[in-house]
Amino acid sequence: TCLAPWNALAVGLAESDTCSEVNAGNTTFTDAYRDVAEKIKVLLDYAEPNPYAYSYNDACTAFARGESAMYVIGSYAVPQIQSVNPDINIDSFTFPANDKEEDNVLNSGVDLQFCVMKETKNKEAVYEVLKFLYEDETIQIYLDEQNAIPCKEGDFTLPSMLDGMQSYIQEGRMADYQDHHYPSEMSVDAMIQTFLMDDSSNAVDTFLSRFDKEWKRYNRDLIAKVKKYQEEKGEQ
């Protein structure tokens, strides 16, 4: 669950195109993520004792049982929480990463989708299923069950537990998850947890330096393509 507060902070404290800018050589994570790293450390002062002992399921269960008043997680966790306590009354708000409310950004993104492969047989049958799934009535059922936000424009009713985020949704004050741009093999979640457990005075510098180093390691092919493109376009 380390990535949940990390993403919530990053969308408000770093530019949404940070990863692209790093690939282009215009910035580094040491510069772009310093404020994020420093503030996620501060969160530990408000956490339960030994928060590292909680897995995602453990944290959802603990919150459902009233063992914590707030849980830094996305709305996607609500079904898991309600499976333990169906009668729980949940509200939510956008993470206050900045001192000024108008500078805050809602963390929102799509990490699940349907697709039809080129070589798929019986495509018409598949399209019929997708058409059904994309009907307003079907989408509303999904929203009600999963406390989700629709990716389709229409007259949908959002779950009441998202009332605290309505203004951000209506105004489009949202940004994608930063970790959607991280290579899975980079294991950023483990890097963040290691950083949070590091009590040394230079923990932030060590973490950010490692982030830059690991990023180059796991994105070297993409970075090379970006560099080649820039050279061809005369940008460098």
Protein language model annotation of sequence segments:
Residues 45, 83-146, 198:
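Extracytoplasmic/periplasmic substrate-recognition and gating elements
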Residues 51-65:
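Short helix-initiation/N-cap motifs at beta->coil->alpha
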Residues 1-25, 68:
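Extracytoplasmic/periplasmic solute-binding protein
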Residues 59-63, 77-80, 126, 139:
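Short, hydrophobic alpha-helical packing/hinge segments within bilobed ligand-binding/sensory domains
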Residues 69-74, 91-93:
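Paired acidic/hydrophobic, glycine-rich loop segments that form the ligand-binding mouth/hinge
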Residues 171-236:
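Conserved C-terminal helix/tail region of periplasmic/extracytoplasmic solute-binding proteins
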Residues 56, 73-78, 110-112:
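Beta->alpha turn/N-cap motifs
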Residues 22-52, 95:
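Glycine-centered hinge/linker elements that transmit conformational signals in sensory
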